[in-house]
């Protein structure tokens, strides 16, 4: 029995994704010296902190217990692992390293991760940072490696977007935030759950169809569009439903239309990555990486 099955079992079950009994319990003020909040998601707060027990600077993520419970109710009857349980199984150079997870004295789930000294990929894209020049294909290749690792180990990230990617000072990319990650099993691929970032949801999710790893590959393609053009393939609308309608019914803008510096070969690769039909996309993240590596111009 593998670690995945040992932790979470197979398929359907009666337990929720809530933290299990017997987890380590801590008092945040005693264990950590907080030096500032670095981010806040819809269900969590993230801090830079000095961990007195580990003797190092770490990233401390504390989840809101009420919001987390409400989110997990969407997976009633399934053995959805808690984010901390997911993170503790992931060991890859391009995935943020997690050291520990448990419960605070206030009853909130927490996660202790490595501190990444760097910038978010979303910031690099939005500011058109010089750091991107000549590194776009390299960064995306690293992201493909992280995604392939997750799929090989039976996980679907389900929220791949520039906001969830960090690039450290050495140019090493780190995939972060596994709050929406689910096991890659039939029970979690049943259509109906449209949880996720609207900009990157694949058509089959929007149509509430059965899904597989190619929902991540679609999101990877949209992320690549943003990296090369600074824009989304489809114009964003103030309404999620209108955004979805455009994605289902309108042709995407080509990367070359959005950025004339993009060559025809790269533009074609990016279009294939976001095909509406899953079978028309690249079959794996590695295949997408290989296609990017074959475009004539590599110094984007």
Regions found by a protein language model. Give the residues of each.
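AlphaC helix of the protein kinase catalytic domain
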Residues: 121-131
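Activation segment signature within eukaryotic-like protein kinase domains
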Residues: 139-140
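A short, aromatic-enriched beta-strand patch in the conserved N-lobe beta-sheet
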Residues: 100-102
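Conserved short submotifs of the Hanks-type protein kinase catalytic core
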Residues: 106-120
């Amino acid at each position: 029995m593998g670690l995945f099955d040992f932790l979470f079992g197979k398929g359907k079950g009666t337990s929720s994704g809530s933290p299990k009994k017997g987890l380590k319990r801590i008092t945040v003020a005693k264990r950590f010296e907080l030096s500032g909040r670095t981010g806040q998601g819809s269900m969590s707060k993230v801090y830079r902190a000095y961990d007195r027990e580990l003797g190092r600077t770490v990233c401390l993520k504390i989840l809101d217990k009420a919001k987390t419970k409400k989110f997990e109710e969407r997976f009633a009857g399934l053995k959805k692992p808690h984010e901390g349980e997911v993170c503790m199984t992931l060991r890859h150079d391009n995935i943020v390293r997690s050291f520990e997870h448990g419960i605070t004295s206030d009853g909130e789930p927490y996660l202790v991760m490595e501190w990444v000294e760097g910038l978010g990929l979303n910031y690099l894209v939005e500011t058109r940072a010089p750091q991107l020049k000549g590194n776009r294909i390299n960064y995306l290749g690293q992201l493909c490696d992280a995604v392939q690792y997750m799929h090989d180990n039976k996980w679907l990230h389900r929220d791949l977007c520039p906001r969830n990617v960090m690039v450290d000072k050495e140019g090493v990319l780190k995939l972060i935030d596994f709050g929406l990650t689910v096991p890659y099993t039939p029970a979690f691929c049943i259509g109906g759950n449209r949880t996720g970032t609207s900009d990157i949801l694949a058509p089959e999710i929007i149509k509430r169809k059965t899904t597989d790893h190619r929902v991540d590959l679609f999101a990877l393609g949209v992320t690549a569009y943003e990296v090369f053009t600074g824009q989304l393939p489809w114009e964003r609308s103030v309404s999620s439903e209108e955004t979805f309608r455009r994605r289902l019914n309108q042709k995407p803008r080509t990367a070359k239309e959005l950025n004339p510096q993009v060559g025809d070969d790269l533009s074609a690769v990016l279009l294939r990555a976001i095909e509406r039909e899953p079978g028309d996309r690249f079959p794996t993240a590695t295949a997408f990486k290989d296609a990017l590596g074959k475009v004539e111009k590599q110094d984007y």
